[in-house]
Amino acid sequence: MRDVIMIPISNDEDLVIAADNSGGVGQKMFDYVKVDYETVAYYGLRVALSECLTVGAKPLAIVMQNLIGEEEWSHLQKGCQTLFSELKCEPIPITGSTESNFKMVQSAFAIMVIGKVRKADIKVRKTPSHAKFACIGKPLCGGEVIEKKHEIGPLPIIKKLLELPYVFEIVPIGSKGVQYEWKKLCEENKLDYCQITSTEIDITKSAGPATCFLISFHPDRTEDIAKAAGGHFFQLNTK
């Protein structure tokens, strides 16, 4: 299954919960990657929101766990607002908690997205045996996320692809890489492929904060998918 929990709340709908976290990323003394806190929240929300959207859910609320400091809350919120603007969507209500009793020497942050999906609209286990596969965006991690952000698969493009009837499934890629998520997708859909290859991207590399997405689609629509994804489309070959 995906990195989400789906809880039935009626005969027709499921509650969807997705989460992400980061540690050692920020502006504190012992942080490994130095970035501002708007960026920390932006990418954290991007991961959790991606997980929610790609199973077909509508996000309803965001919960932030801020172990950075009280002053940073507004910066974290601003990072979330940046993503809302990018997606051209209404702001999602945000709540959460801040560690204000102790000063941390290393940044820690977690974020949860809560959404809802009609059971008939769940986009899981929808990939048929004749499907083709591609990666949207390149796998990046650590400092690469900032240095090569132009190579990240844009979330507005993913949102657009989710609306196309010839796109079967989209899976955000995390730290275990494209190959791992592809194998999971094949297992869920009972597909008999042995492996995938790519001459353009490293399919075993961590994709950090979901910098790329695995997509399954109708084989007759390769050109349409490539056009919609712009320069972010990378064909995956199956055996």
How should these model regions be labeled?
Residues 1-239:
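Helix-biased detector of long, well-ordered alpha-helical tracts
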